Amino acid sequence: MITLNGQWKMKQVKEKEWHQGTVPGTVYTDLLTQGLIVDPYVGENEDEVRDLSYNDYLYEREFLISKEVLNNERNLLICKGIDTIADLLVNGKQIGICENMHREYEFDLTGFLKEGVNRIRVYFHSPMKYMQKLYEKKPLWGVTSTVPGYQY
C-alpha cells in the first residue's frame, strides 16, 4: 500500500503561485499555517476569509510507482473525506469525481499509472458556486439565515 498523505502543493486555480499543502487537511488550514490568511477562529475574522469558498483550488503531488506495483492485477486509489466537489486526475487523465465528503471513494487506477514518477491532481470546485448553480435549477426551502442552496 502506498499512502499519499503528507506534503502536497496547492494553489488557488486562478493564481500562479503554489504553496505547501498537507493531506489530510484543508485549504483554510494550509493558508493559515503559511500566514496567508487571518485566523478565522479569532474574533470576527471569519468574515474576512468567507469569500475564499468562492474560489477553486488545486492540490498536486508526485509519487513513485515501482514495476512490481505496476504489475499488480489492480491498483486502487481510496479517498476518504474529500470535501466536497472535486475532480481527480492521474497523469493528466480524469479518474473520477467526488461529490460528497461523507463517503469513501474507490478508483481503479489500472491503465492510468506508469513506472516511475506519477502525478495526481485534485481540482476542488467552489462549494458556493456549486450550491448556487443547483439552487438556481431547483430551489429548496430551508433556513433563511444561511446560504441559499446549502442543502446541496
Predicted regions and their residues:
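Short Gly/aromatic-enriched secondary-structure transition segments
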Residues: 17-25
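Accessory beta-strand-rich segments of carbohydrate-active enzymes
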Residues: 2-14, 27-34, 54-152
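Short, P/G- and charge-enriched loop/turn segments at secondary-structure junctions
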Residues: 46-51
